[in-house]
Design a protein with these regions (language model features):
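Short, intrinsically disordered, mixed-charge
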Residues: 108, 123-124
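Short, well-ordered loop/turn sites that connect or cap secondary structure elements
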Residues: 115, 121-122, 141
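Ferredoxin-like alpha/beta domains used as RNA- or RNAP-binding modules
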Residues: 1-109, 135-211
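Glycine- and Gly-Pro-enriched alpha-helical subdomains that act as flexible
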Residues: 125-129, 133-135
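Residue-level marker of beta-strand positions
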Residues: 120, 126, 144-146
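Internal active-site segments that recognize and position negatively charged phosphoryl groups
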Residues: 108, 112-117
Length: 211
């Protein structure tokens, strides 16, 4: 994921909801949202929540999605522009494209505990697509492609822990996951209705960039 100078858990608190950036910690009582569900800062606990509207609401939605997928502004704008040129609703195109990123698919497959960890696995050359090394986190997967971890990583403690936790999570309809062999096959393109966490109102982002 793109580097953020701000502490990861503060990003979730800023958005007021879990973005699942911290991996396994997000599923425990140690999660910052569970412990301190108020905006970060010296007066965060006593500060009244502002009711956002218009531009403020659009901006917050954009920031939430950027942080969820770990993107910088230039990268995110590029995805928006590509989504505008593609057939179909721009907002849906955007979310589907982000879901197809290889680092996200590694996470969705339960091979990593977070998108950030998935990105590191990709960058370090541990991920294979159809048996060939791909070290580009932004690589967009397509139906029939198989994503796997190289055998050396099958006994990695972080990978094993991520796999065990993923077994209790909901399935991903567009992925056929083989946890025993540390791989997954893309059986279809992701659909917008399959992406539920965090809640995203992508039309607000489309409106923001259309100005």
């Amino acid at each position: 994921l793109a580097r953020h100078r701000e502490a990861i858990c503060r990003l979730c608190r800023r958005e007021g909801q879990k973005l699942f950036l911290k991996g396994l910690r997000c599923f425990t009582e140690k999660c910052a949202i569970e412990k301190r569900n108020f905006v970060p800062g010296q007066h965060g606990q006593s500060r009244r929540a502002k009711k956002l509207a218009g531009y403020g609401l659009q901006l917050r939605e954009k920031q939430k999605v950027k942080r969820t997928y770990g993107l910088l502004e230039r990268q995110f704008r590029n995805y928006v522009e590509k989504s505008e040129r593609a057939q179909g609703p721009t907002g849906e195109n955007l979310i589907v494209m982000l879901e197809r990123r290889l680092d996200n698919v590694v996470w969705r497959s339960g091979l990593a505990s977070s998108r950030s960890q998935g990105r590191q696995l990709v960058l370090h050359g541990h991920v294979r697509v159809n048996g060939k090394k791909v070290n580009i986190p932004s690589y967009l997967v397509s139906p029939s492609e198989e994503i796997s971890l190289k055998e050396k990583m099958h006994q990695n403690a972080m990978v094993l822990e991520a796999r065990n936790v993923a077994q209790s999570q909901s399935t991903v309809p567009w992925l056929e996951i083989d946890r025993d062999n540390f791989k997954a096959r893309v059986v279809a393109l992701p659909k917008r209705e399959n992406v539920q966490t965090p809640p995203i109102t992508e039309q607000l982002i489309v409106e923001l960039y259309s100005k």
